[in-house]
């Protein structure tokens, strides 16, 4: 199995290179480059001050850290990092709780999971094939 190489550039002295907690961790932790106050029921764009060069066959998906979600009611807003994006990685940090959340420089705020890109072709058709499930969604297959 060949390894893909993701190149990382720090855009400031406050940036931290992403790390994995263990060899089997799917995601690489992302770190805040600055201090932030995230008020209850609000969101903040948290800068990491890193830029990435992701291989053409991949993209990066920003995901929440389970402990922040469970213990602090923190969510991460949609985050897909395309392979051709070269700007600073920012994380949409959402506080769904009733208390302010303080982020300190160097805190782990999210994780990035590198996934293989499916190269598909989109074709318009007038009818789709039938399935047992049909158009039933949102819990129709069981909870």
UniProtKB/Swiss-Prot annotation:
EC number: 3.6.1.23
One function term, GO molecular function aspect: magnesium ion binding
Keywords of this entry: Hydrolase, Magnesium, Metal-binding, Nucleotide metabolism
Catalytic reaction annotation: dUTP + H2O = dUMP + diphosphate + H(+)
Any one Gene Ontology BP term: dUMP biosynthetic process
Top-rank taxon: Viruses
Cofactor(s) recorded in Swiss-Prot or TrEMBL: Mg(2+)
Family under the similarity heading: Belongs to the dUTPase family.
Cited function: This enzyme is involved in nucleotide metabolism: it produces dUMP, the immediate precursor of thymidine nucleotides and it decreases the intracellular concentration of dUTP so that uracil cannot be incorporated into DNA.
NCBIfam families xrefs: dut, PRK00601.1
Name of the molecule in the record: Deoxyuridine 5'-triphosphate nucleotidohydrolase
């Amino acid at each position: 199995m060949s390894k893909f190489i993701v190149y990382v550039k720090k855009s400031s002295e406050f940036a931290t290179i992403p790390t994995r907690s263990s060899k089997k961790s799917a995601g690489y932790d992302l770190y805040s480059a600055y201090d932030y106050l995230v008020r209850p029921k609000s969101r903040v764009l948290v800068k990491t001050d890193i830029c990435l060069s992701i291989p053409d066959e991949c993209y990066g998906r920003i995901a929440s850290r389970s402990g922040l979600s469970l213990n602090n009611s923190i969510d991460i807003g949609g985050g897909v990092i395309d392979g051709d994006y070269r700007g600073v990685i920012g994380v949409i940090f959402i506080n769904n709780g009733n208390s302010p959340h303080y982020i300190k420089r160097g805190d782990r705020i999210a994780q990035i999971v590198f996934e293989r890109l499916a190269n598909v072709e989109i074709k318009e058709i007038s009818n789709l094939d039938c399935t047992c499930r049909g158009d039933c969604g949102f819990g129709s297959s069981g909870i």
